[in-house]
């Protein structure tokens, strides 16, 4: 099976990357690259594309049961059998999948030896299956090696990969990223490499219509964050900008109505989040995601996670205020405000209007504005589940880990340790970013 791209190494600032990709840290580039799945099947009924797959064995990786409950898992299994394949299921992938789940799934793959891996559901089962795929193809690779930015060896020696999304946010069905949680450390780690971009994506809105309201809100704001961060990223380009802007406009028009039960808008959001994913997979992200990755599981010992999409929604307005101190980023945020029709005469006014719009959207979606008011059920609460003294005690380590996150290098303004701690405090207390 063929591999994507060239794997010659280049050392820049002590970080090894591939010469077919851009450097992750600041505005130093080799040849840029734009990578998408080879095929993308979309529209109602697109799941039937599985009937056309060629292979001998397929392993379907799924999560907690919604795909089975609504009949989509049975249909996928039947379509693959109609294609002449033997099918095995790997079920029960948890939200925010763990390293242990990845290793367990990879072991099942090694025993079954599929030539197609079919990941089906939300971001968690697809992300987990991507990491399982790496371990399946390279049994001796460690999780630490998987997390080396753009350091994955060539895949597709044993299997191809198809991702079928059932939620409208992560867009992992079209991206070069996977997020895996090390619960011993309380840290979410991004795996980033074009090798794990799926070969085939199936974007069937029938699956997304099953999402509960809270999930619509969180995944929708995840998608909005993807699009905005991609547009202001230091790796943005002519190929990613139109995708990001169009996704932002679609989310502006569709998310709140989708949340309130409009199924036509729900279908449109499924496309919007996919466009946002195409943009950020190639333009990269910023410190909203760095902070979300490092706070998500940081307080799990207090009985809850800060759900990724909700974390992005809370942090995005604060990060815009921080990044807008950089003139280039301020201009890009102004472009977004103009494209959304928010008004404003000066760039400062446009940035303020964009921030205000996003905060209103959070209100409409019942997402709190800060960690202090983030309830264990993710809804606004007078007293959230993260105690102030615990947050402050863990703050230095969380800030340091956020700075080291793979998404930080493409942020338009690089924070110091002190600035990251101050920014996280603003996200805890919902205070003004004035630095």
Predicted features along the sequence, with ranges:
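Carboxylate- and glycine-rich phosphate/diphosphate-binding segment that chelates Mg2+/Mn2+
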Residues: 177-283
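Glycine/threonine-rich beta-strand-loop-alpha-helix active-site module
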Residues: 100-206
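Gly/Pro-rich interdomain helix-loop hinge
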Residues: 301, 305, 309-390, 433
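Short, amphipathic C-terminal "tail helix"
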Residues: 389-435
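ATP/NTP phosphate-donor binding region
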Residues: 14-116, 371
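Glycine-rich phosphate/pyrophosphate-binding beta-alpha loops
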Residues: 169, 274-312, 405-409
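Flexible, glycine/charged-enriched surface loops at secondary-structure junctions
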Residues: 234-243, 257-268, 283-288, 306-309, ...
């Amino acid at each position: 099976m063929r591999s994507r791209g060239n794997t010659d190494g280049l050392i820049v600032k002590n970080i090894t990357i591939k010469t077919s990709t851009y450097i992750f840290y600041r505005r130093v580039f080799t040849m840029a690259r734009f990578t998408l799945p080879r095929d993308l099947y979309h529209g109602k009924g697109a799941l039937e594309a599985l009937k056309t797959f060629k292979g001998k064995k397929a392993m379907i990786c799924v999560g907690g049961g919604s795909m089975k409950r609504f009949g989509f898992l049975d249909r996928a299994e039947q379509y693959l059998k109609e294609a002449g394949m033997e099918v095995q299921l790997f079920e029960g992938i948890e939200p925010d999948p763990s390293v242990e789940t990845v290793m367990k799934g990879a072991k099942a793959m090694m025993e079954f030896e599929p030539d197609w891996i079919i990941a089906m559901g939300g971001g968690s089962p697809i992300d987990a299956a991507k990491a399982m795929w790496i371990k399946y193809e390279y049994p001796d690779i460690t999780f630490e090696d998987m997390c080396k930015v753009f350091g994955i060896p060539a895949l597709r020696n044993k299997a191809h990969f198809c991702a079928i999304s059932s939620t409208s946010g992560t867009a992992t069905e079209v991206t070069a990223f996977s997020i895996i949680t090390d619960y011993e450390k309380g840290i979410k780690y991004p795996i980033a490499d074009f090798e794990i971009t799926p070969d085939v994506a199936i974007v069937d809105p029938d699956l997304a219509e099953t999402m509960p309201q809270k999930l619509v809100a969180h995944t929708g704001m995840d998608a909005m964050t993807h699009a905005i961060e991609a547009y202001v990223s230091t790796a943005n380009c002519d190929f990613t900008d139109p995708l990001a802007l169009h996704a932002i406009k679609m989310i502006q028009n569709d998310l709140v109505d989708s949340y309130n039960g409009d199924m036509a808008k729900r279908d449109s959001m499924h496309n919007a989040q996919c466009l946002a994913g195409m943009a950020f997979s190639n333009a990269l992200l910023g410190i909203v995601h760095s902070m979300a990755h490092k706070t998500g599981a940081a307080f799990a010992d207090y009985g809850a996670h800060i759900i990724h999409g909700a974390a992005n929604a809370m942090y995005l307005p604060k990060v815009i205020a921080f990044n807008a101190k950089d003139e280039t980023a301020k201009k890009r945020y102004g472009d977004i405000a103009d494209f959304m029709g928010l008004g404003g005469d000066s760039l400062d006014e446009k940035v303020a209007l964009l921030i205000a719009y996003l905060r209103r959207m959070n209100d409409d979606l019942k997402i709190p504005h800060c960690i202090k008011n983030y309830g264990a059920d993710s809804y606004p609460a007078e007293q959230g589940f993260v105690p102030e003294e615990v947050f402050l005690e863990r703050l230095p380590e969380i800030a340091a880990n956020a700075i080291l996150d793979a998404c930080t290098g493409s942020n338009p303004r690089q924070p110091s340790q002190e600035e990251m701690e101050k920014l996280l405090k603003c996200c805890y207390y919902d205070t003004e970013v004035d630095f």
